[in-house]
């Protein structure tokens, strides 16, 4: 592979890594619990959860309802935000759900 082709592949990889096409979301499960996750396509991911094809946690707690989503994040920022939300007490999660990012 010549130098120009290597450079082009490197640039394309950098563009993909910096994309802000990820979102963090919160679902309310059938038992009233809250589930937090990340996805590129939140609508499709919620559909998977609703059909019992999502996370093991939500499969046994159907139905699920989307309450919150925050879009425009890189994958790494979405993972960080997901971890932050998961570490919060339920009361703080409820505050976030009522914020400007409501679904």
Task: Enumerate the predicted regions with their spans.
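GIY-YIG nuclease catalytic motif and its immediate N-terminal context
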Residues: 1-55, 59-72, 76-86, 90-103
């Amino acid at each position: 592979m010549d130098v120009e082709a290597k450079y082009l592949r490197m640039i394309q990889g950098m563009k993909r890594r910096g994309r802000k096409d990820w979102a963090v979301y919160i679902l309310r499960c059938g038992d009233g619990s809250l589930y937090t996750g990340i996805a590129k396509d939140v609508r499709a991911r919620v559909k998977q959860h609703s059909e019992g094809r999502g996370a093991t946690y939500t499969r046994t707690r159907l139905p699920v309802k989307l309450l919150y989503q925050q879009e425009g994040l890189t994958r790494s920022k979405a993972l960080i935000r997901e971890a932050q939300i998961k570490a919060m007490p339920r009361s703080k999660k409820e505050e976030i759900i009522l914020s400007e990012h409501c679904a």
